[in-house]
């Protein structure tokens, strides 16, 4: 074995996994992709036991060389399409943001979403890993008002399974192309 200076190695700490449930989140960045008619939303847990969770995950991934500086951990990202058929869902997102930020009215400028609070409900979803095995990840199931999250007035839906695994009819599409964000260490809603 090679000689390692153990005084220079930080011991691993217990890993906290973000559980399914509802969270008060802060929007860190919203980037428009006009050609695809969608917003890339980068968010962070803003309150409670898991406040700052995605920042911690991002720092850990950068430290281990699995993410480039300035990028945001994949789990703290979601896409909201504003294509014609998706407008009711986009409207639901905007309504949740407006209800969560008294006096705020969305004016079709995605940059105004930065620093706004919104309720996020996470659920588990199965996907096919590169190794051919079915894996599970957390995804944003829906957005709601922060008041509903704080009062517990939301429901976590059951895990979404792959077709064939339980006959759900679900098929996965890849949405892993997100923009790099600049990070000065602060969150816009702190």
Positions of the model-derived regions?
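Short beta-rich binding modules
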Residues: 1-190
